[in-house]
């Protein structure tokens, strides 16, 4: 009996402990749910105020007006730095950018986008030399962002009248610059009009009766190099047909090395209006560096070989869907092929340079046929697809310059004999 009694008392003890634990937890929950009233209304009508515990004291709300007032005061603290500083040496005034100034970023957003550039009529020029060349050619400046005042002092003072001068940190210029080593000055100019520009007299003295037509050139580096070659050869004008990369894109400007302000450039020209930009009696020649002509250039039996080169020569992705091979062969303009080193400068000439991706357009061949022009062959060795567009343009332009120089020398020699 002792053992069962002992087991019964142990079970009863454990049960009591469980009941006590549950009762303790219940009391804790009840204590947590109890709330002390803030005010007590007695039957007599008296109100008794109860004091809150320290942890129950209400927090003071921060008034919104004070935070707004602090926000409104922040620009006022930086307003003294917006006061224009006077440049006493030339009587010009410049602004010093204040923290959070967005004038530079807003302008850069416009001039670095082609649609915005064309809509706003503004371009970006970077570097002291390029800016000086633009001012010398008659470009109209709108604003200059610079990190040191000495950079502005190097520019012609008479060209800086009514121009916004804003001094910014060099880090801000570096963030927006396309150069590896920024020069600390950026200029915003109105998009130049070739009719109103005053180009340097020395290049004009050596100008040739030679016009360059760029057809669907899309690589900025190639176009900048071509413009540089055109300025060096002495072209009278450069026409960029619709579809070419913008001549005023920063990469083209960087590759051009100032050629934009040494030769007139007409941008975004429709093929229907190209003859309006050419001198009277101009013959249009098309650059042809297709290797298939290297062996048949002087032969009269071009036939199928002409067509083999034409398929790579033209951008037929727009036309070949609805035409079979025979129809296209009859439809193509018939142009005579001539070696580039033979005389082709007897009359005013225009040279068409096509892009490397699609070649020249059908419109260029039709214009060449209507003006009595030819294909100028640059022979390359078998296995080589073609030359770089900038290289082909340089070869033809300087060959034309050589031929014209020989004509001038022969003419002066004949006059000396008489």
Curated annotation (Swiss-Prot):
| Positions of region (Disordered) | 41-90
GO terms for MF: identical protein binding; RNA binding; rRNA (guanosine-2'-O-)-methyltransferase activity
InterPro entries recorded for this chain? Alpha/beta_knot_MTases, MRM3-like_sub_bind, Ribosomal_eL30-like_sf, rRNA_Methyltransferase, SpoU_MeTrfase, SpoU_subst-bd, tRNA_m1G_MTases_N
Catalyses which reaction(s): guanosine(1370) in 16S rRNA + S-adenosyl-L-methionine = 2'-O-methylguanosine(1370) in 16S rRNA + S-adenosyl-L-homocysteine + H(+)
Please list the residue ranges that the record marks as compositionally biased, kind Polar residues. Answer: 65-85
Q: Which UniProt keywords apply?
A: Methyltransferase, Mitochondrion, rRNA processing, S-adenosyl-L-methionine, Transferase, Transit peptide
| Targeting signal (transit peptide) range | 1-40
Pfam (any one): SpoU_methylase
Q: Does the keyword Nucleus apply?
A: no
Give, as one word, the top-level EC class.
transferase
Gene3D superfamilies the record matches: 3.30.1330.30, 3.40.1280.10
| Record: residues binding S-adenosyl-L-methionine | 354, 378, 387
GO cellular component assignments: mitochondrial matrix; mitochondrion
Quick one: signal sequence residues?
none
What EC number(s) are associated with this protein in UniProt? Answer: 2.1.1.-
Subcellular location(s) per record: Mitochondrion
The answer to whether UniProt assigns keyword rRNA-binding to this entry is no
Record field: compositional bias (Basic and acidic residues): 47-58
For this protein, the record's SUPFAM superfamilies field holds: alpha/beta knot (SSF75217), L30e-like (SSF55315)
Q: Which PANTHER family match?
A: RRNA METHYLTRANSFERASE 3, RRNA METHYLTRANSFERASE 3, MITOCHONDRIAL
User: What does this protein do, in the record's words?
Assistant: S-adenosyl-L-methionine-dependent 2'-O-ribose methyltransferase that catalyzes the formation of 2'-O-methylguanosine at position 1370 (Gm1370) in the 16S mitochondrial large subunit ribosomal RNA (mtLSU rRNA), a conserved modification in the peptidyl transferase domain of the mtLSU rRNA. Also required for formation of 2'-O-methyluridine at position 1369 (Um1369) mediated by MRM2.
- Which family, according to UniProt? Belongs to the class IV-like SAM-binding methyltransferase superfamily. RNA methyltransferase TrmH family.
Q: Under which name does UniProt file this protein?
A: rRNA methyltransferase 3, mitochondrial
The taxonomic lineage of its organism, from the top, reads: Eukaryota, Metazoa, Chordata, Craniata, Vertebrata
Gene name per UniProt: Mrm3
